[in-house]
Amino acid sequence: MNHFELFGLPSQFQLDGSLLSSKFRELQKRFHPDNFATASERDRLMSVQKAAQINDAYQVLKHPISRAEYILAEQGMEIRGEQQTMQDPMFLMEQMELREELEDIADCSDPESALFDFDSKVSKMYKQHLASVEQELNDGLWAEAADRVRKLKFIAKLKNEIELVEDKLLG
Protein backbone atom coordinates (compact mmCIF):
# COMPACT_ATOMS: atom_id res chain seq x y z
CA MET A 1 0.00 0.00 0.00
CA ASN A 2 1.52 3.32 -1.01
CA HIS A 3 1.24 6.58 0.95
CA PHE A 4 -1.67 7.88 -1.10
CA GLU A 5 -3.63 4.65 -0.69
CA LEU A 6 -2.98 4.71 3.05
CA PHE A 7 -4.80 8.04 3.25
CA GLY A 8 -7.43 7.13 0.65
CA LEU A 9 -6.21 9.89 -1.67
CA PRO A 10 -5.61 9.85 -5.43
CA SER A 11 -1.97 9.30 -6.42
CA GLN A 12 -1.32 12.79 -7.74
CA PHE A 13 0.85 15.75 -6.88
CA GLN A 14 -1.99 18.18 -6.19
CA LEU A 15 -3.78 17.34 -2.99
CA ASP A 16 -6.06 18.97 -0.48
CA GLY A 17 -3.90 19.73 2.56
CA SER A 18 -6.83 19.98 4.96
CA LEU A 19 -8.21 16.63 3.76
CA LEU A 20 -4.76 15.07 4.22
CA SER A 21 -4.59 16.50 7.76
CA SER A 22 -8.05 15.26 8.71
CA LYS A 23 -7.35 11.76 7.33
CA PHE A 24 -4.04 11.79 9.22
CA ARG A 25 -5.77 12.62 12.52
CA GLU A 26 -8.40 9.96 11.84
CA LEU A 27 -5.79 7.26 11.14
CA GLN A 28 -3.64 8.41 14.03
CA LYS A 29 -6.58 8.07 16.38
CA ARG A 30 -7.57 4.65 15.03
CA PHE A 31 -4.09 3.13 15.19
CA HIS A 32 -2.72 4.90 18.26
CA PRO A 33 -0.74 2.39 20.36
CA ASP A 34 -2.75 3.32 23.49
CA ASN A 35 -5.79 1.75 21.84
CA PHE A 36 -3.92 -1.56 21.83
CA ALA A 37 -2.60 -1.47 25.41
CA THR A 38 -4.59 -4.57 26.39
CA ALA A 39 -4.12 -6.34 23.04
CA SER A 40 -1.68 -9.14 22.31
CA GLU A 41 2.02 -8.41 21.96
CA ARG A 42 1.71 -8.97 18.19
CA ASP A 43 -1.19 -6.50 17.87
CA ARG A 44 0.63 -3.90 19.98
CA LEU A 45 3.70 -4.21 17.79
CA MET A 46 1.59 -3.95 14.63
CA SER A 47 -0.13 -0.79 15.94
CA VAL A 48 3.24 0.82 16.66
CA GLN A 49 4.44 -0.06 13.16
CA LYS A 50 1.22 1.21 11.59
CA ALA A 51 1.41 4.46 13.58
CA ALA A 52 5.01 4.95 12.39
CA GLN A 53 3.95 4.25 8.79
CA ILE A 54 1.12 6.78 9.08
CA ASN A 55 3.46 9.44 10.52
CA ASP A 56 6.11 8.83 7.85
CA ALA A 57 3.57 8.91 5.02
CA TYR A 58 2.04 12.12 6.35
CA GLN A 59 5.42 13.86 6.55
CA VAL A 60 6.19 12.85 2.95
CA LEU A 61 2.84 13.88 1.51
CA LYS A 62 2.57 17.10 3.52
CA HIS A 63 5.55 18.76 1.82
CA PRO A 64 5.49 19.41 -1.95
CA ILE A 65 9.13 18.52 -2.60
CA SER A 66 9.06 15.23 -0.70
CA ARG A 67 5.67 14.43 -2.25
CA ALA A 68 7.12 14.97 -5.75
CA GLU A 69 10.16 12.85 -4.86
CA TYR A 70 7.84 10.11 -3.62
CA ILE A 71 5.76 10.16 -6.82
CA LEU A 72 8.96 9.95 -8.86
CA ALA A 73 10.21 7.04 -6.71
CA GLU A 74 6.91 5.26 -7.34
CA GLN A 75 7.75 5.60 -11.05
CA GLY A 76 11.23 4.14 -10.56
CA MET A 77 13.11 7.46 -10.37
CA GLU A 78 14.66 7.60 -6.92
CA ILE A 79 16.07 11.10 -6.37
CA ARG A 80 15.67 11.44 -2.58
CA GLY A 81 19.04 11.97 -0.98
CA GLU A 82 20.90 11.68 -4.26
CA GLN A 83 24.17 13.50 -4.71
CA GLN A 84 23.76 14.06 -8.44
CA THR A 85 25.21 17.35 -9.57
CA MET A 86 23.02 19.83 -11.39
CA GLN A 87 23.51 19.63 -15.15
CA ASP A 88 22.03 23.06 -15.97
CA PRO A 89 24.87 25.63 -15.95
CA MET A 90 22.50 28.57 -16.53
CA PHE A 91 20.43 27.62 -13.50
CA LEU A 92 23.56 27.16 -11.37
CA MET A 93 24.87 30.56 -12.45
CA GLU A 94 21.52 32.13 -11.56
CA GLN A 95 21.64 30.46 -8.14
CA MET A 96 25.16 31.78 -7.51
CA GLU A 97 24.07 35.28 -8.49
CA LEU A 98 21.03 35.08 -6.22
CA ARG A 99 23.19 34.00 -3.29
CA GLU A 100 25.58 36.89 -3.95
CA GLU A 101 22.60 39.24 -4.05
CA LEU A 102 21.42 37.84 -0.71
CA GLU A 103 24.87 38.36 0.82
CA ASP A 104 24.89 42.00 -0.34
CA ILE A 105 21.51 42.80 1.24
CA ALA A 106 23.01 43.46 4.67
CA ASP A 107 25.05 46.33 3.18
CA CYS A 108 22.03 48.04 1.54
CA SER A 109 20.74 51.37 2.83
CA ASP A 110 17.37 49.69 3.57
CA PRO A 111 18.18 46.01 4.12
CA GLU A 112 14.69 45.07 5.35
CA SER A 113 13.03 46.40 2.21
CA ALA A 114 15.69 44.82 -0.01
CA LEU A 115 15.22 41.49 1.75
CA PHE A 116 11.44 41.71 1.34
CA ASP A 117 11.82 42.36 -2.40
CA PHE A 118 14.37 39.58 -2.75
CA ASP A 119 12.15 37.15 -0.84
CA SER A 120 9.22 38.04 -3.11
CA LYS A 121 11.35 37.35 -6.19
CA VAL A 122 12.54 33.97 -4.88
CA SER A 123 9.04 33.00 -3.71
CA LYS A 124 7.70 33.74 -7.19
CA MET A 125 10.44 31.58 -8.70
CA TYR A 126 9.60 28.78 -6.23
CA LYS A 127 5.90 28.90 -7.13
CA GLN A 128 6.68 28.84 -10.86
CA HIS A 129 8.89 25.78 -10.47
CA LEU A 130 6.30 24.10 -8.25
CA ALA A 131 3.61 24.64 -10.91
CA SER A 132 5.95 23.20 -13.55
CA VAL A 133 6.66 20.14 -11.39
CA GLU A 134 2.94 19.56 -11.01
CA GLN A 135 2.38 19.81 -14.78
CA GLU A 136 5.32 17.54 -15.59
CA LEU A 137 4.16 14.93 -13.07
CA ASN A 138 0.60 15.10 -14.42
CA ASP A 139 1.93 14.64 -17.95
CA GLY A 140 4.17 11.71 -16.96
CA LEU A 141 7.33 13.61 -17.88
CA TRP A 142 9.34 11.89 -15.15
CA ALA A 143 12.87 12.94 -16.17
CA GLU A 144 11.81 16.57 -16.61
CA ALA A 145 9.98 16.52 -13.28
CA ALA A 146 13.05 15.03 -11.58
CA ASP A 147 15.26 17.82 -12.96
CA ARG A 148 12.70 20.41 -11.88
CA VAL A 149 12.53 18.93 -8.35
CA ARG A 150 16.32 19.16 -8.12
CA LYS A 151 16.05 22.86 -9.03
CA LEU A 152 13.20 23.32 -6.59
CA LYS A 153 15.42 21.96 -3.81
CA PHE A 154 18.03 24.62 -4.62
CA ILE A 155 15.37 27.32 -4.45
CA ALA A 156 13.93 25.93 -1.20
CA LYS A 157 17.42 26.01 0.31
CA LEU A 158 17.76 29.63 -0.79
CA LYS A 159 14.42 30.41 0.87
CA ASN A 160 15.80 28.92 4.11
CA GLU A 161 18.90 31.10 3.76
CA ILE A 162 16.64 34.14 3.36
CA GLU A 163 14.98 33.26 6.67
CA LEU A 164 18.39 33.09 8.36
CA VAL A 165 19.33 36.53 7.01
CA GLU A 166 15.95 37.86 8.12
CA ASP A 167 16.55 36.51 11.64
CA LYS A 168 19.94 38.27 11.72
CA LEU A 169 18.52 41.57 10.44
CA LEU A 170 15.53 41.62 12.75
CA GLY A 171 17.54 40.23 15.65
Swiss-Prot record:
Disulfide bond sites: none
SUPFAM superfamilies attached to this UniProt entry: Chaperone J-domain, HSC20 (HSCB), C-terminal oligomerisation domain
SMART domains, per database record: DnaJ
Residues making up the signal peptide according to the UniProt record: none
Source organism, top-level taxon: Bacteria
Residue ranges of domain J in the record: 2-74
Alphabetic keyword roster: Chaperone
GO biological process annotation, one example: protein complex oligomerization
Pfam families: HSCB_C
InterPro entries xref list: DnaJ_domain, HscB, HscB_C_sf, HscB_oligo_C, J_dom_sf
Molecular function, one GO term: ATPase activator activity
GO cellular component, one term: iron-sulfur cluster transfer complex
NCBIfam families in alphabetical order: hscB, PRK05014.1
Subunit (UniProt): Interacts with HscA and stimulates its ATPase activity.
Function: Co-chaperone involved in the maturation of iron-sulfur cluster-containing proteins. Seems to help targeting proteins to be folded toward HscA.
UniProt record similarity statement: Belongs to the HscB family.
Protein name as it appears in the record: Co-chaperone protein HscB homolog
Record organism: Vibrio parahaemolyticus serotype O3:K6 (strain RIMD 2210633)
The organism's taxonomic lineage, starting at the top: Bacteria, Pseudomonadati, Pseudomonadota, Gammaproteobacteria, Vibrionales
Gene assigned in the entry: hscB
